[in-house]
Amino acid sequence: MASKQLSREELDEKAKQGETVVPGGTGGHSLEAQEHLAEGRSKGGQTRKEQLGHEGYQEIGHKGGEARKEQLGHEGYQEMGHKGGEARKEQLGHEGYQEMGHKGGEARKEQLGHEGYKEMGRKGGLSTMEKSGGERAEEEGIEIDESKFTNK
């Protein structure tokens, strides 16, 4: 196989060694087992989402994220996010990952409207490796209207 994609046999071997090779398949001891676990978890999530409604389901996810953040501490939580981003980048490839970021930016622009997006860009442009944009704006007396950051 000339592509970077692993064959089913190679993935099955990795799964048998304890590696998760299917997103959502954690705990499965073969490729097939991981596929079944992932499918079941996905269906279970959909059912729960239907029961709770969109807002309720989002709230449950938010609470779970907060609990995980508390368990791991700030650095651990950041590291987990970084690893997740790297894994997603690997899945999508460079162009796909850039496209995802572009779509996210466009969606955010739509949510905030032109003025809010522009104001957020001003703040982001002030940030450095040492200080956030908010800290720099405060130090330099630059007015940032964060009320514009709310969704339309």
Swiss-Prot record:
Start and end residues of each stretch annotated as Disordered:
1-63, 116-152
Inducers of expression: By abscisic acid (ABA).
Region (4 X 20 AA tandem repeats), start-end ranges: 44-123
According to the lineage, what is the superkingdom?
Eukaryota
* Keywords recorded for this protein, A-Z: Repeat
Pfam families recorded: LEA_5
Q: Where is the composition biased (Basic and acidic residues)?
A: 1-17, 32-63
InterPro entries for this protein? LEA_5 (IPR038956), Sm_Hydphi_plant_seed_CS (IPR022377), Small_hydrophilic_seed_prot (IPR000389)
sequence-type repeats, residues: 44-63, 64-83, 84-103, 104-123
What are the GO BP annotations of this UniProt entry? Answer: response to abscisic acid
Q: In which tissues is it expressed?
A: In seeds only. Specifically located to vascular bundles in the cotyledon and axis of the dry seed. Also found in the epiderm and outer layers of the cortex in the embryo axis.
Q: Name one GO cellular component term.
A: cytosol
Which protein family is named in the record? Belongs to the small hydrophilic plant seed protein family.
The entry's function note states:
It is thought to provide protection for the cytoplasm during the desiccation stage of embryo development.
Would you tell me the protein name for this molecule?
Em-like protein GEA1
Give the originating organism.
Answer: Arabidopsis thaliana
